[in-house]
A protein has these predicted regions:
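Active-site loop/oxyanion-hole signature of alpha/beta-hydrolase fold enzymes
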Residues: 54-98, 249
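Conserved alpha/beta-hydrolase catalytic His-Asp/Glu region
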Residues: 132-134, 138, 145-203
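Catalytic active-site module of serine/aspartate enzymes centered on a nucleophile-bearing elbow/loop
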Residues: 227-258
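Conserved serine/cysteine hydrolase catalytic core
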Residues: 176-234, 240
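Gly/Ala-rich beta-loop-alpha elbow adjacent to hydrolase catalytic centers
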Residues: 99, 103, 107
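Flexible "cap/lid" loop of the alpha/beta hydrolase fold
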Residues: 108-113, 117-150
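Conserved HGGG/HGGXW glycine-rich cap/lid loop of the alpha/beta-hydrolase fold
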Residues: 11-67
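N-terminal cap/lid segment of alpha/beta-hydrolase-fold proteins
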Residues: 1-12
Length: 258
């Protein structure tokens, strides 16, 4: 485990680091809302198709093994800047960044705001658009339907039933302010929009999606902007857990070095 101070007040991001060939691109794995990088990505990072690179399995501020400051805003921009500070401390440049769900949105903002840190992007069913809020739904939609006061006063108790035991295993580790503010800012989106940031990036970008899902909105526009959209069979939202072999092979193809 490694760590770096990422705020003036002293909050620290922590990550699990796997060693690899220093001549090859470093890989950075970013988890989704209420998750943690190692439980979601460790097997993939060690898969024969992806192993051999220095790999940082980073827990976003407020989640997993990272600190949970209650005075942090937890916007997508704030998350991206905190990750950037950690990568600078780790002496990472031009990394291959793999981001799942909200972590994919953070990865896009990271690439837009700190372009020297990101060489290629793999987005794993990442959220590109604002999310409608609906009471009782799991994840971003249900959390953001509360006010912060409601959520902190007891609304968070509903999450255990709504998200199920697997997601709850890591969600219970999150700071409650971090969970609420991250979800709310993800629901609202950014300015410029995440999708617009993605299409404007000048780096190789791949978007992995579950094959059984409805067609990804704006697929043609993404393709015209150079974003490769790849459908993965036999999986739901957690592609790397549901079909680890197909995920590893698709990610390896996206990150194949010339």
């Amino acid at each position: 485990m490694r760590d770096a101070q990422v705020t003036p007040e002293g909050a620290r991001i922590r990550w699990v680091e796997l060693p690899g060939d220093p001549r090859r691109a470093t890989r950075v794995y970013l988890h989704g809302l209420g998750a943690s990088a190692a439980p979601y990505f460790a097997a993939s990072a060690a898969h024969p198709a992806l192993a051999g690179h220095r790999s940082l399995l980073v827990d976003l501020l407020g989640f997993g093994i990272s600190d949970r400051p209650a005075d942090f805003a937890y916007t997508l921009e704030d998350h991206a800047d905190a990750v950037a500070a950690a990568l600078e401390a780790a002496e990472v440049q031009a990394a291959d960044v793999i981001g799942h769900s909200m972590g994919g949105a953070v990865a896009i903002v990271l690439a837009a705001r700190h372009p020297h840190l990101v060489g290629r992007l793999v987005l794993v069913d990442a959220t590109l658009d604002p999310v409608p809020v609906v009471h009782g739904q799991p994840g971003v939609s249900g959390i953001a339907a509360h006010t912060e006061e409601e959520f902190l006063a007891g609304g968070w108790h509903q999450l255990r039933e709504n998200v199920g035991p697997h997601w709850w295993a890591t969600m219970r580790l999150a700071g409650r302010e971090a969970l609420y503010r991250s979800a709310t800012h993800r629901a609202l989106g950014t300015e410029p929009a995440i999708r617009d940031m993605l299409t404007a990036l000048p780096i190789p970008r791949t978007y992995l999606r579950p094959e059984a899902d409805q067609p990804l909105p704006g697929t043609r526009e993404l393709a015209e902007a150079g974003v490769e959209v790849v459908s993965i069979p036999d999986c739901e939202h957690n592609i790397m857990l549901d079909n680890p072999e197909a995920f590893a092979q698709a990610t390896a193809r996206a990150l194949r070095e010339a």
